């Protein structure tokens, strides 16, 4: 029988019917009876945590605790002044953390959408949109792309360049080639490793 549901009273040792040896310090009986339940969490009167509410006491907290002056009671349900709350503007977001012009200034609701498994989903744990820098156009080269005529497209210039008469080939320029060491056994026999 399960000793937890045994009808035995508190303090009665277990009926060790199978002769199981318990290690030293193992409780051989039920624990002492638990203390009686008390509805009051603090025994006796506690001056720090007073129970109840004194009628007529203003419920507001003083805005300047050092002066001790309590603001007068107001029937308004809002205990705070109106100036405490920021006013929502009709203009776009202008935050000191979102630099205008340098980065995008969309507020962070979710990460930019990504196409995953052919389904556009939104990653909720992405970085704020203000962190992503604005894309810069690729730099344009100073010269004209090889094989093209300035001011034209590839479709316009390809046929003309391919069918145009080739000029007379230029004679090869004289190039001086340095003299290399003759092949053979090197002057060294062993190079120590570098590690």
Swiss-Prot record:
Belongs to the FAM168 family. The keyword Transit peptide does not apply. Pfam families: TCRP1 (PF14944). It is a multi-pass membrane protein. One of its GO terms (cellular component) is perinuclear region of cytoplasm. Residues 43-142 are extracellular. It comes from Bos taurus. Its main location: cytoplasm. This is Myelin-associated neurite-outgrowth inhibitor. Keywords: Acetylation, Cell membrane, Cell projection, Cytoplasm, Glycoprotein, Membrane, Phosphoprotein, Transmembrane, Transmembrane helix. Glycans are attached at residue 46. The modification Phosphoserine is found at residue 6. May form homodimers. May interact with DAZAP2, FAM168A, PRDX6, RBM6, TMTC1 and YPEL2. Interacts with CDC27. N-glycosylated. The modification N-acetylmethionine is found at residue 1. InterPro entries: FAM168A/MANI. PANTHER family: MYELIN-ASSOCIATED NEURITE-OUTGROWTH INHIBITOR-RELATED. The keyword Phosphoprotein applies. Residues 1-18, 165-195 are cytoplasmic. Inhibitor of neuronal axonal outgrowth. Acts as a negative regulator of CDC42 and STAT3 and a positive regulator of STMN2. Positive regulator of CDC27. It is found in: Cytoplasm, Perinuclear region; Cell membrane; Cell projection, Axon. The chain crosses the membrane at residues 19-42, 143-164.
